[in-house]
From Swiss-Prot:
NADP(+) binds at residues 130-134, 153-158, 217, 240. Belongs to the shikimate dehydrogenase family. SUPFAM superfamilies: Aminoacid dehydrogenase-like, N-terminal domain, NAD(P)-binding Rossmann-fold domains. This is Shikimate dehydrogenase (NADP(+)). Pathway: Metabolic intermediate biosynthesis; chorismate biosynthesis; chorismate from D-erythrose 4-phosphate and phosphoenolpyruvate: step 4/7. Keywords: Amino-acid biosynthesis, Aromatic amino acid biosynthesis, NADP, Oxidoreductase. GO terms for biological process: amino acid biosynthetic process; aromatic amino acid family biosynthetic process; chorismate biosynthetic process; shikimate metabolic process. Homodimer. The active site is at residue 65. It comes from Halorubrum lacusprofundi (strain ATCC 49239 / DSM 5036 / JCM 8891 / ACAM 34). Pfam families: SDH_C (PF18317), Shikimate_DH (PF01488), Shikimate_dh_N (PF08501). It comes from the Archaea.
Length: 274
């Protein structure tokens, strides 16, 4: 039996175990998905220890995504983003590498969420609200897919710093957010606004329009105020569970080499969110 898992602190809230185990069960893969909660400064040691104990793959969540870079051979996109959320011990176990391979499937989660909803990103103008970890993954994902990206953040300097790292991107504060969105095709909320206060929104309703595709990274609640108001404006809306699903699907496929059973994994995830 193969063991996969998640390291983070805390991890008790994670929806990854039922999602991944639904995938293993559907395909008849003999595997389990478990959680590990090391001390906040023990990411490198924890990843090394997991590999030594025969763990086949790990997802990595806060606060370890940046520190995990020091424990892996990062894939190019993970290195550019500056964060790892998926560790594959396969090359190390096969003797083909000295360290496990590190990936960032958060970026793939963004791209595949749009693709699943038939949204073409190449040549589009995109606005990402938020310059934290989710914002970095979204900005790089959109640029990698061929979109022109503008990052908007309450602290403009953080948006500019992120934009400087993303090819062709611009960054700034929130003062001109309405004008930026007016000319955009794609909008991503990469902040946590709408999670703890469900009636809060990062984008005023009068900024939204019917030519937008709107992805909200918040997945609890599934239907945020932003998505309700975007739908009312005629926009295409994509809830955060799709992004969560497809980052997990991408990790599943890296680890197993099999096509993930997306429908089964999605059903398991949404059952947990109900």
């Amino acid at each position: 039996m193969d063991v996969y898992g998640l390291i983070g602190n805390p991890v008790g809230h994670s929806l990854s175990p039922p999602m991944h185990e639904a995938g293993y069960g559907t395909l008849g893969i003999d595997a389990r998905y478990v959680t590990f909660e090391p001390a906040p400064d023990d990411a490198v040691a924890a990843i090394g220890g997991a590999g030594a104990l025969g763990v086949a793959g790990l997802n990595v969540t806060v606060p370890f995504k940046q520190d995990a870079l020091d424990a892996v051979d990062p894939a190019p996109l993970a290195e550019r983003i500056g964060a790892v959320n998926t560790v594959d011990f396969g090359p190390l176990r096969a003797g083909d590498a000295d360290r496990p391979r590190g990936h960032n499937t958060d970026a793939a989660g963004v791209k595949r969420a749009f693709s699943h909803h038939d949204i073409e990103l190449a040549g589009r103008d995109a606005v990402v609200v938020g310059a934290g970890g989710a914002g970095r993954a979204a900005a790089f994902a959109l640029a990698d897919a061929g979109a022109t990206v503008h990052v908007a953040n309450r602290t403009a300097e953080r948006a500019v710093d992120l934009a400087d790292a993303v090819p062709g991107a611009t960054g700034g504060g929130l003062d001109d957010l309405g004008d930026r969105i007016a000319g955009a095709d794609v909008l991503v909320n990469a902040t946590s606004v709408g999670m703890d206060e469900p009636e809060a929104t990062p984008v005023p309703a009068d900024h939204l329009h019917g030519d937008l595709a709107v992805l909200d990274a918040v997945y609890a609640p599934i239907e945020t105020r932003l998505l309700r108001e975007a739908a009312a404006a005629g926009a295409t809306t994509i809830d955060g569970a799709w992004m969560l699903l497809f980052q997990g699907v991408e990790a599943f496929e890296i680890w197993t080499g099999a096509d993930a059973p997306v429908e089964a994994m999605n059903a398991a995830l949404r059952a947990e969110l109900e």
